């Protein structure tokens, strides 16, 4: 399902843990990493697509996460010309995405990137919040920056709660 402008409707998923870190997944058989994402099927809402992709790509279900936020608008990126399939009709020149910020409410052990018969990912790890903006492939970088900027007011308080719950081991200078 490609819109009149050549963009494929898609959802992107940012999963954070209680420490405010985000799940970063390695694409199957590649050295590139990204957030889980996937197309919206005809008749499917963005939220329904998000839950389907969540299960297909990382093996998590609705009971394993809590929706914290979603982007207000569709965010778009164009594919590099070398990745556009010019022989298909209609031609898809990029993705338009609705993004969801989820908090993992279950355990790390519930994450399973091998859930699908044709897995998208072969590994994953927790990374600091802003890390993906610098590391994602260049043509997705602007969308990632916009997503993370929009979600930051929700995630930053989580990080502050964690740092405030840790004991502070300050030191006193010895006076002579």
Curated annotation (Swiss-Prot):
Gene Ontology MF terms: mRNA 5'-diphosphatase activity
CDD domains cross-referenced by the UniProt entry: NUDIX_Ap4A_hydrolase_plant_like (cd03671)
Start and end residues of each Nudix hydrolase domain: 6-149
Motif (Nudix box): 38-59
CC terms in the record's Gene Ontology section: cytoplasm
Cofactor(s) of this protein: a divalent metal cation
Domain of life from the UniProt record: Bacteria
Enzyme nomenclature, EC number: 3.6.1.-
Keywords: Hydrolase
Any one biological process term the GO annotation gives: mRNA catabolic process
Function field: Accelerates the degradation of transcripts by removing pyrophosphate from the 5'-end of triphosphorylated RNA, leading to a more labile monophosphorylated state that can stimulate subsequent ribonuclease cleavage.
Record-stated family: Belongs to the Nudix hydrolase family. RppH subfamily.
Protein's name according to its UniProt entry: RNA pyrophosphohydrolase
Organism of provenance: Proteus mirabilis (strain HI4320)
Primary gene name: rppH
